[in-house]
Amino acid sequence: MGVILYQRLSMSLSEKIGLRLLTSLDPEKAHNLAIRALKLGIVSNTPVFKSKALELNVAGLKFNNPLGLAAGFDKNAEAIKPLMNFGFGFIEVGAVTPNAQKGNPKPRLFRLREDKAIINRFGFNNDGMIKVSKRLSRRPSNGIIGLNLGANKTSADRISDFATVFKTCKEFVDFATVNVSSPNTENLRELQAHKELRELLNKVMSCQNDSKIKVPIFLKIAPDLKKGELENIALVASETKIDGIIATNTTTSRYNLKSIYQHEQGGLSGVPIFETSTRVLAQLYSITDGQIPLIGVGGVFTGEQLFQKIRAGASLVQIYSALIYSGFSVTTKILKELDLTLKNHGFKNVEEAIGTGAKEWL
């Protein structure tokens, strides 16, 4: 009750009206309108919450806080500057493919209000690496920006696609993510298999050797993996010396959902995948002995849930669905709650809490 009251008080009247308007529209139209409003500067900012206890270093990068915006919200790097004003510790744009593509037929985005969830089957719709790289070249110098790498649906060589996008855009970003876990591009998840994954990551990592510009490379995996598959992924990650693993993408599973859209094809995100994605996170932390930085994603709406992800093994955590249901002020709310929760549990800073509760999820 207290959290709900705080959320209502912390949300401005304009944000309440804006959310009500957007949620009355078709989900994809609402999303596009939100991006346009951000670009035009007509979305009011919320006070940015800062605390020394939330600062940390991951993969050679210094983050003001561990809360990031997941890929998929700003697919084409159109609204980086206004998004940074909401207090995110980092933002990931994309996924971006070599050539522009329209993605899957509409409708392809569904709000599951009763479940506080979303199902999407976008299929890597984006403007292509050339247009996106030009936008990234004009990004603000402050803040940490990552790029989610994708492959074209009709590509004859998807492994080369990832490397091509990386080479084209890497000088403009602070990290890059190899996304082989989207369920909306046919056969993409097959690249998570040991042999294919090693070939892919070696190809992308080799681009680092050919250039003076080196940025951390992360791998984004699916939540629908068994322990043996996670062990293989951890082994390949260690062999190829990538800088981190993002766990997890959306799921193809359905968890006793209430919405009429529950049977729509696509990837499910939001509250229903919190436990599954957090368990995968904890398994990876255990398998890797905490030696590979992990970025948690899936179902985080509160500071307490962010804290649970961190205790399960995440150094950083990303959100998306929370913005759809709670607005941009949710970032400040979550960070304030995390700061207080750390203190209440006796942690001096966020780094002290990483992985301390991983065993509870195994």
What are these regions (language model features)?
Residues 62-68, 141-149, 210-225, 286-296:
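Short beta-strand/loop segments at the ligand-binding rim of alpha/beta enzyme cores
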Residues 78-83, 163, 225-239, 286, ...:
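Catalytic cores of alpha/beta
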Residues 26, 69, 91, 132, ...:
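Conserved, mostly hydrophobic/aromatic
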Residues 35-49, 182-196, 235-290:
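Glycine/Thr-rich beta-alpha phosphate-binding loop at enzyme active sites
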Residues 92-101, 180-182, 244-252, 306-333:
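Glycine-rich phosphate-binding active-site loops on the catalytic face of alpha/beta enzymes
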Residues 13-56, 120-125:
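An N-cap/entry alpha-helix motif that binds or orients negatively charged groups
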Residues 94, 99-142:
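A gly/proline- and charged-residue-enriched helix-loop-helix capping module
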Residues 100-116, 256-269, 324-347:
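C-terminal helical cap(s) of enzyme catalytic domains, especially alpha/beta-barrels
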